[in-house]
Amino acid sequence: MTQLTNFSESFSNQNSNLHQPYNFNSHQPPEENHYYVREPNGKRPFPVEFELDMEYVPRTKRRFDKISACLENFSISNDKPSPINICRESSSDEEMDEVYDDSNFDQCTESTSIPLVVEPDDEPAVAKKIRLDESIQRYFEKCRQGPIDFLPKPEKLKGNEMVIWQPRILVSPKNDFNMAGRIQEIDDEEEDRVNEEIKTRIIENEGMIDEDTRNETTGIVELGTGSDHSDIGSSWSSPMASPTGSSQIVELDPDSPNSLTNGSVTDEEMMEFE
């Protein structure tokens, strides 16, 4: 172990001799058997006056305290600032336990508050009035002297009036507790009629009733047939041939031997039709 330690010490000394600073701005090439290392530039040094107080404080905490100190006397309201925002300590990690009395509050507000500056108006108060045209001024003066003719006036009925104007009384629904005219009672017959209308509308909206097929018709549903022609008068005609295995609805004449009304259809065919 002793020899290994001595060997390592001699090796480190040898490297220290080879390691020399080199001016990278010079145009002279480096000498042989020497290597040069550029020392990295460190971060910007922290201000010395804050090193003692903020040595063990995280960066986020320091940033928070710095911004809080800048916004200590800042207020966006015109109200009197509270003593918590003005006379609080600069460090935010200590909680304020004592309550300031009125004397300390007045001293803080007098020293830190900024007086409000009231700027005078550039124009006199007369300029803020509305300036009217001469014709409008004459019209207003005429209306002051005599009553306006086109406005309705309370008079007795003469009997030859065409339309009697009655002012409408505006009543707020919030102040009107009388529900007359808003709620209408119905009897049992009216309730049944309304329920039937509601059921009909629901069925029509769901597509269970078609307006074109309200008339009762007789027909046979042929399942699994691939024929392109029908017996008599198909209710659905298309220039394209129906594909194999599709269903087809065919209307039949009542005199046809396969009609549903003449009794020639068996029970099995009726079950297939259903």
UniProtKB/Swiss-Prot annotation:
Organism superkingdom: Eukaryota
Residue ranges of the TM segments: none
Biased composition (Basic and acidic residues): 29-38
Biased composition (Low complexity): 1-17
Positions of region (Disordered): 1-38, 222-274
Sequence ranges of Polar residues compositional bias: 18-28, 239-249, 256-265
Name of the featured protein: Uncharacterized protein R107.5
Species name: Caenorhabditis elegans
